[in-house]
C-alpha cells in the first residue's frame, strides 16, 4: 500500500523534546496570558530523538510544532519537514504559512487565576482576547506604528497570512471563539482537541473550520469530559473537516492506527467511512488546515514527493512503514539499517545499538 506522507497537525517535538526534563521544557512562555511575540521555532531542538521515531514508525513527513496551551495567545507555530538537520531552519517547510496558537477554557484561567491575575474565568478569557485584538487592529491600521513583534503576528492573522489553531474542548466555547473571530475579522483554521466538536458539526462545516482531534482520548479533565468515540465519524457525516492529531511523542508514531480506531467507532454505529477518506484525516485534511495542501497531502503531479510505502493495509494495527520518502529522497528503509535517521544526541549513549 502507498499513501501520501503522514502529516501531524499538532506536535510538540523539539519544544518539549526527549529526554523530558525541565531544562528542555520550552513550549509555554507562561509569563503573560498573551504572548503573540514568541515563535515556536525558536524553541525547537532539531536533535529531538522523537523526529526519527515519528518518521520510521509513523511515516510522518511533515508536522506542525506549536507552543503550548498555558496562554490565551501562545505564539507562532512552525511547519517542518521531517528531515535530519543541524538547525531548525534546515527543517522548515518551504513556503508554509505560520500558524498562531490560541487556547480557550481551563488552561489559561487556571494558570493565571492561580496567580491572582486575569483571566481567572472563561469570561475573563474572552475579555483579554478581545482587548488584545482591538489593540492589534489599531496597530494594523496605523502605518506609522512602531514595530511590535506581538502585534505584527496578530496583524498577520488579521490579513490571513497566519492561520489560527485554537486549542478548545467544549462546543459552547468553540462557538464563542467563532463569534469573536467574526467580530475581530479573522478566521479560525482549526480547533484542536475539540472533544465536543460532534455537537456543532454543522457550525464547523458552515465556517470551514477543521477539527483536529484524538480518536479516543477524553475525560481527563472537566472540559474534556463529554467526549465520545464517534466524534470523527459524526463530523465526517456532517460534512465537516476531520483531522486526527497526536499532541504526543508516542501517538505521532501511530497516527494511522488512531485514524483506524476512529473509523471503527463510526462503523459500529453504521457510519461506514471509506478508507480513502480516513487516510485524508492524516494527510490532505491536515495539509489543508495548515495551508500546505497545494504542496503536499496527496499524491498528485507537481506536488512534493512525500510518500509512505507500507508493509500492509495502513489502517491495520499490524502494519508499519516499509519505506518513507520526503521530497523524493528515501529517508527510511526498514530493510536497510543504514537508511534510518538517528539523532546525534543518541550517538554514544547507553543503548546506542538500538537506534543504529
Spans of model-derived segments:
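Intein/HINT protein-splicing elements and their conserved insertion hotspots or analogous self-processing inserts
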Residues: 125, 335-356
